[in-house]
UniProtKB/Swiss-Prot annotation:
One of its GO terms (biological process) is translation. This is Small ribosomal subunit protein uS7. PANTHER family: RIBOSOMAL PROTEIN S7. It holds the Pfam family Ribosomal_S7. One of the primary rRNA binding proteins, it binds directly to 16S rRNA where it nucleates assembly of the head domain of the 30S subunit. Is located at the subunit interface close to the decoding center, probably blocks exit of the E-site tRNA. Keywords: Ribonucleoprotein, Ribosomal protein, RNA-binding, rRNA-binding, tRNA-binding. The gene is rpsG. Belongs to the universal ribosomal protein uS7 family. The keyword Ribosomal protein applies. Part of the 30S ribosomal subunit. Contacts proteins S9 and S11. It comes from Thiomonas delicata (Thiomonas cuprina). HAMAP family: Ribosomal_uS7_B.
């Protein structure tokens, strides 16, 4: 590990339409091969579909979905005396949001709807209501942490 100065986090510009930093980060998560305009059209298309489907503010739905999917604890492998233990650890806030965004994207990719914007819209609506594949993933991670609670004294 380097002993030199710590490198700062890259600044993410707010997206122009809503001025929301989380939406800008989510666009970067959706983006493939640097094609940001395509990622923007997917996310904005999903927001439009959410607006049409629910009649509510898409930013509210998005932030509700994000906060529902964010994991509180996860398990990390720790080797102690020749045995590997799955140790539950609390997730840092930045990683919490990153994991939630990734899980929503992956869940949307696996859905059956025609366009990615439609898949993303439906996944976001379901996640905001506490359903969907992304929520299932979060619950699975929480279950793993709960099952391995006995090893929590092997802190990092």
């Amino acid at each position: 590990m380097s002993r030199r100065r710590v490198i700062g986090q890259a600044e993410i510009l707010r997206e122009p339409k809503f001025g929301n930093l989380d939406v800008a980060k989510f666009m970067n998560v959706v983006m493939l091969s640097g094609k940001k305009s395509i990622a923007e059209s997917i996310v904005y298309g999903a927001f439009e579909a959410i607006q049409n489907k629910t009649g509510k503010d898409p930013i509210e739905i998005f932030s509700q979905a994000l906060s529902n999917v964010k994991p509180m604890v996860e398990v990390k492998s720790r080797r102690v005396g020749g045995a590997n233990y799955q140790v539950p650890v609390e997730v840092r806030p930045q990683r919490r949001a990153a994991l939630a965004m990734r899980w929503i994207r992956e869940a949307a990719k696996k859905r059956g709807e025609k366009s990615m914007a439609q898949r993303l819209a439906n996944e976001l609506v379901e996640a905001s209501e506490g359903r969907g594949a992304a929520m299932k993933r979060r619950d699975e991670v929480h279950r793993m942490a709960e099952a391995h609670k006995a090893f929590s004294h092997f802190r990092f």
